[in-house]
Amino acid sequence: MNETQIQRETRQVVEDVLEKTNLKQGALFVLGLSSSEVLGGHIGKESSQEIGELIVETILDILGSRGIHLAVQGCEHVNRALVVERQVAEQFGLEIVSVHPTLHAGGSGQLAAFKFMQDPVEVEFIKAHAGLDIGDTAIGMHVKHVQVPIRPILREIGHAHVTALASRPKLIGGARAHYPQDAIRKT
């Protein structure tokens, strides 16, 4: 698998999702990543630290330039806990938990986040504004209600299936209520 191609595809997809979700500075963005799937393997079976680092570093660069915070979801072996900057955990009132990821418990994306973030910690839950799922890792539990599927410009990064979620406020009030237009809500 060509690392330049994976980096280019990651950049294309993330920039496209950010454009479609219109995330603002200070927003939370969750990443679910299976490096095994990117390489054409089965999720959790052929993890690659190099691919995890390539993808996470690329995404951190894109999000950081926009002031958007990254949360990297781990696998079920760490109860899908997430790596965030300590400052983000404190700002959003997130409960820090005690676990340090490994390649096969947390995964390559979490290890990369621990490498590239300034003061990484693990938290149990978040409510992100949007997210990207590379390799069918199931990020929905960490995206705010109401979740709206986003179709990325590419359907795959490497060999991994790619999906994305945005969120919008709940519509309340009933038949007489009026709702503001937003780019996320489908009409």
Swiss-Prot record:
Cross-referenced Gene3D superfamilies, in alphabetical order?
Hypothetical protein TT1679
On the tree of life, the source organism's domain of life is Bacteria
Q: Which SUPFAM superfamilies match?
A: TTHA0583/YokD-like
Q: Which HAMAP family match?
A: UPF0340
Family, according to the entry, reads as follows: Belongs to the UPF0340 family.
In Swiss-Prot or TrEMBL terms, this protein is called UPF0340 protein SPN23F05980
Q: Which organism is it from?
A: Streptococcus pneumoniae (strain ATCC 700669 / Spain 23F-1)
